[in-house]
């Protein structure tokens, strides 16, 4: 081969190699378009039980009233069922997409029994759940429950978990009186059938105005940030509707930011929507123990799972379950970041606080 031909051939090979190398480089990630983020469905079916009629879902009510759901291109359809047990049966039948007010213990029990649910957000971080007794009962602290009868279920880990940490066996060291409904727990204490009782947030008015009983403490006094109600859905549904989940969370985060600045207006709205007297609503919503929060609170959920497992509330098969496989914090973080970018100027301190909380409880 002639010298000039050899040079030309070498240059051609070099140029070709450079071109091929350029083709192998990753292009900068494109910003998702509005079409890419469009919700996969415009309707989310949210569980709503007869037991919730006193307060419903306050963040969702705000989101509807303020147009936040509409801004995200979705609407929430309330699916009425009788109670929490019916919520999970309806989820299994495909009649409900999302549950938000069924506690943390109940979805964890469902997961332990093999139901493929994923927790992706929160509603109440701590409800103001009162522990009460007759007015003349002496009280020195949580250990006073040992050897007594408590009108409640032992899966209330906000109380049984700290007792477990103290070295007690809560399932056997306390007699648990399970009743048909929570009003009956109050009656059980009044009649002397139970020494102590615990009821849910919305019964604070009934407990506070009952002259025969007194509030000794609240669940969050024993276990701060215990995770009262988590938001969960079938894992497959979340995987198939990530944009819808983000849209729902964005609407609820904005509602939480609104609530942060408009407490009294929210009370008036809840009273109007539920036809309840403001005094009944303020008995819990003004209580400092009452903390609504959309954050999934992964660390609190893990702690709850460990307490329930260690107390023997799960089957042996549940020991093979990694609860982290049933917690999705990424979609919430994406929704929070998007809200802060779009609406952060409306309440900067709120978004800074929520970002700090996420970093503390979800990493």
State what each model feature region is.
Residues 32-181, 188, 195-201, 212-219, ...:
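Short, glycine-/small- and polar/acidic-enriched structural segments
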